[in-house]
């Protein structure tokens, strides 16, 4: 099998929520493989500029656009501007997302709706405007960042799980409608990863750290760079006949019901 199947050189990839964290890790993977990265964030232009500098330090070609993925007018304007200034978007990764940890009986409706708007509605909005152009070109790759919560429930993350479960089904429906245009739509479902956000609990003796180590067959937290391979695969010709699937990069969590805490 030729490595050319995994070639993304010269491709343009829009990755929402790519100023930090797992979004940046996936975008860096594509960038190091030769793609131009369109960095997106909504907090501040300074944060976008700082992220671009980090990409460029690694030799990655990156440009940045600030827009709110949940506001259709901003998305439509940004997509038009990107295609005019950078070029046709070949790859879209819908990564931007939020989580609110509140038991359902205590959760405000406004908070529930905000999570669903960002985690489920915004991938629809961004995809709608990017894919219209992909349809004309009869080519494109869309990757929706799902979650293990697309498959499993967990206390206090009901809104997030509902949105990510919906995103899995949206991925399948996008694939169903757009496959005839040579557009592949798939998902990536990350497990638990070592990031700055999880650093405070990734210490020996912390109950959640012990739970993750015991619950994951690989017996460790994931490295954000572990997501790059799945992103490159789903962005390249290697996945041209793969449509409507979620690749879980979780160290095996979803493969097992777990083990007793006293079992080696």
Curated annotation (Swiss-Prot):
It is an enzyme of class 1 (oxidoreductase). Induction: By ulvan and rhamnose. One of its GO terms (molecular function) is 2-dehydro-3-deoxy-D-gluconate 5-dehydrogenase activity. It catalyses: 2-dehydro-3-deoxy-D-gluconate + NAD(+) = 3-deoxy-D-glycero-2,5-hexodiulosonate + NADH + H(+). Signal peptide: none annotated. It is found in: Cytoplasm. It holds the Pfam family adh_short. Its EC number is 1.1.1.127. Its main location: cytoplasm. The keyword Kinase does not apply. Keywords: Carbohydrate metabolism, Cytoplasm, NAD, NADP, Oxidoreductase. The active site is at residue 160. One of its GO terms (cellular component) is cytoplasm. It comes from the Bacteria. CDD domains: Ga5DH-like_SDR_c. Substrate binds at residue 147. Homotetramer. 2-dehydro-3-deoxy-D-gluconate 5-dehydrogenase involved in ulvan degradation. Ulvan is the main polysaccharide component of the Ulvales (green seaweed) cell wall. It is composed of disaccharide building blocks comprising 3-sulfated rhamnose (Rha3S) linked to D-glucuronic acid (GlcA), L-iduronic acid (IduA), or D-xylose (Xyl). Catalyzes the reversible reduction of 2,5-diketo-3-deoxygluconate (DKII or 4,6-dihydroxy-2,5-dioxohexanoate) into 2-keto-3-deoxygluconate (KDG or 2-dehydro-3-deoxygluconate) with a concomitant oxidation of NADH. Belongs to the short-chain dehydrogenases/reductases (SDR) family. This is 2-dehydro-3-deoxy-D-gluconate 5-dehydrogenase. It comes from Formosa agariphila (strain DSM 15362 / KCTC 12365 / LMG 23005 / KMM 3901 / M-2Alg 35-1).
């Amino acid at each position: 099998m030729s490595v050319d199947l995994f070639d993304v050189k010269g491709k343009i990839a829009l990755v929402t929520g790519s100023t930090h964290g797992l979004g940046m890790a996936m975008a860096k993977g594509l960038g190091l493989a030769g793609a131009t990265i369109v960095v997106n964030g909504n907090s501040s232009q300074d944060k976008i500029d700082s992220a671009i500098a980090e990409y460029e330090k690694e030799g990655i070609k990156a440009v940045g656009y600030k827009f709110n993925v949940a506001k259709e007018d901003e998305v439509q304007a940004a997509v038009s501007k990107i295609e005019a200034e950078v070029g046709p978007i070949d790859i879209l990764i819908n990564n931007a997302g939020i989580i609110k940890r509140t038991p359902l009986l205590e959760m405000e409706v406004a908070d529930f709706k905000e999570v669903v708007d960002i985690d489920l509605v915004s991938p629809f909005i961004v995809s709608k405007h990017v894919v219209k152009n992909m349809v004309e070109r009869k080519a494109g790759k869309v990757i929706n960042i799902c979650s293990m919560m697309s498959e499993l429930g967990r206390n206090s993350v009901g809104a997030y799980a509902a949105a990510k479960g919906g995103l899995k089904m949206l991925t399948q429906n996008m694939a169903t409608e757009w496959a005839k245009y040579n557009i592949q739509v798939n998902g990536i479902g990350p497990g638990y990863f070592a990031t700055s956000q999880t650093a405070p609990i990734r210490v020996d003796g912390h109950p959640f750290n012990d739970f993750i180590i015991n619950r994951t067959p690989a017996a460790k937290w994931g490295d954000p760079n572990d997501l790059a391979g799945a992103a490159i695969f789903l962005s390249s010709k290697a996945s041209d006949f793969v449509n409507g699937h979620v690749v879980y990069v979780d160290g095996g969590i979803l493969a097992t019901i777990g083990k007793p805490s006293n079992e080696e």
